[in-house]
């Protein structure tokens, strides 16, 4: 049996999911947390049972060694030879990587060179890649980029109205993120609608602590709300989303903060947390709003307002919409936010059933049968998309 492992390496974590391919059955999944810190945590699910250990794991290489040993110890695999493919999530591929690629030394250098565009993520992603290559050097390794799916955006979508030389010299442009998720749900929507994705105009709403909207026409990303960084677009858990750029020097002058400190506020202290003053967790805000907390209610209203702006804009851009997709933590689980987003979209042919909306984390159509625009909840599955890309590249080598 051939097995593919999907990896998401963070600076102090390593998430993994092992698939039997090509059946796409999940064999096991888990996470290594607090790598390089005291009391690291290793969690793995075997036969439905979650097993948790606290153990010191000084670096990613040790984490990979331990992960592979645990797969053997728990009889998930008989030997390392059963693993025939490894897929690595990489946050930023820039313009260099419009699709997933086989990893060789040059690809690693290119990903490292792109680290200035994603300083928090790409170095960690590379650390994970190197750790696996050292221990399983002969296994096909594939890099799957968050930005790749959005590389089909036309220049009018991705260029900023800045001196063109900034784009040529520094690569300043919109890149977009959550691409693997947007791609997965758009393909799944086509399956559920029984139509080729090439015929469809889709609005995909990836709503989690980080959130982005995408306009997908003919199976290709035409525009997306995040920009040069994941800070742009809609209001999020702790991120501001779009603001007037002149606010940055204004805030610096008023507060005495440096540009870096202001950026930190925009990334970590803004969004729903900033407006509410309570929490970045939507569940907390829904609870507080239900108790009559005006600021919690306002934070939710701002979130929905920004989503509406993109839905209207992208519907106009594609000259109509065939389906609106909700995915990720909030999109899949919050009937409250879905209701707020869908109310007022009747003008564009969205007719949805409030009774069908009372669901969490379940794949489901929410629209009435006569609705010209379909509304679907599709739980995202980025790990499966990674495993599929590994399988494709492995089979084409």
UniProtKB/Swiss-Prot annotation:
InterPro entries: Ac/propionate_kinase, Aliphatic_acid_kin_short-chain, Aliphatic_acid_kinase_CS, ATPase_NBD. It is found in: Cytoplasm. The keyword Mitochondrion does not apply. ATP binds at residues 15, 206-210, 281-283, 329-333. Keywords: ATP-binding, Cytoplasm, Kinase, Magnesium, Metal-binding, Nucleotide-binding, Transferase. Pathway: Metabolic intermediate biosynthesis; acetyl-CoA biosynthesis; acetyl-CoA from acetate: step 1/2. Transmembrane segments: none annotated. Substrate binds at residue 89. Its cofactor is Mg(2+); Mn(2+). It catalyses: acetate + ATP = acetyl phosphate + ADP. The record marks 178, 239 as: Transition state stabilizer. Its main location: cytoplasm. Its EC number is 2.7.2.1. One of its GO terms (molecular function) is acetate kinase activity. Mg(2+) binds at residues 8, 382. GO terms for cellular component: cytoplasm. GO terms for biological process: acetate metabolic process; acetyl-CoA biosynthetic process. It is an enzyme of class 2 (transferase). Gene3D superfamilies: 3.30.420.40. Mg(2+). Can also accept Mn(2+). HAMAP family: Acetate_kinase. Catalyzes the formation of acetyl phosphate from acetate and ATP. Can also catalyze the reverse reaction. Belongs to the acetokinase family. This is Acetate kinase 1. The gene is ackA1.
């Amino acid at each position: 049996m051939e097995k593919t492992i999907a990896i998401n390496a963070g600076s102090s974590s390593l998430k993994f999911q092992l698939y039997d391919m090509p059946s796409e059955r999940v064999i096991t999944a888990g996470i290594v947390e607090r790598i390089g810190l005291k009391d690291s945590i290793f969690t793995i699910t075997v036969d439905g049972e979650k097993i948790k250990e606290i153990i010191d794991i000084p670096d990613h290489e040790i984490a990979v060694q331990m992960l592979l040993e645990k797969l053997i110890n728990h009889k998930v695999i008989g030997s390392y030879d059963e693993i025939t493919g490894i897929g690595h999530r990489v946050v930023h591929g820039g313009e260099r990587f419009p699709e997933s690629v086989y990893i060789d030394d040059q690809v690693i250098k290119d990903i490292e060179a792109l680290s200035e565009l994603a300083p928090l993520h790409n170095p960690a992603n590379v650390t994970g890649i190197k750790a696996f290559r050292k221990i399983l050097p002969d296994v096909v390794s594939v890099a799957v980029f968050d930005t790749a799916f959005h590389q089909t955006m036309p220049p009018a979508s991705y260029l900023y109205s800045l001196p063109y030389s900034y784009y040529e010299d520094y690569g300043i442009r919109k890149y977009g993120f959550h691409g693997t998720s947007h791609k997965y749900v758009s393909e799944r929507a086509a399956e559920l609608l029984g139509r080729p994705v090439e015929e469809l105009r889709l609005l995909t709403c990836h709503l989690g602590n980080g959130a982005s909207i995408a306009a997908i026409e003919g199976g290709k990303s035409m525009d997306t709300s995040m920009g040069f960084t994941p800070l742009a677009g809609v209001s999020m858990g702790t991120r501001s989303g779009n603001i007037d750029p002149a606010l940055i020097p204004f805030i610096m002058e008023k507060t005495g903060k440096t540009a870096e400190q202001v950026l930190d506020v925009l990334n970590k202290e803004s969004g729903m947390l900033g407006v509410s003053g309570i929490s970045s967790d939507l569940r907390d805000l829904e609870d507080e709003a239900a108790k009559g907390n005006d600021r919690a209610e306002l934070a939710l209203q701002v979130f929905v307002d920004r989503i509406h702006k993109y839905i209207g804009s992208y519907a106009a851009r594609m000259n109509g919409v065939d389906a609106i997709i909700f995915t990720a933590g909030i999109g899949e689980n919050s009937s409250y936010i879905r209701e707020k987003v869908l109310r007022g979209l009747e003008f564009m042919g969205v007719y949805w059933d409030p009774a069908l909306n009372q669901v969490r984390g379940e794949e489901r159509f929410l629209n009435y049968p006569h609705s010209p625009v379909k509304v679907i909840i599709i739980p995202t599955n980025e790990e499966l998309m990674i495993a599929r890309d590994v399988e494709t590249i492995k089979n084409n080598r």
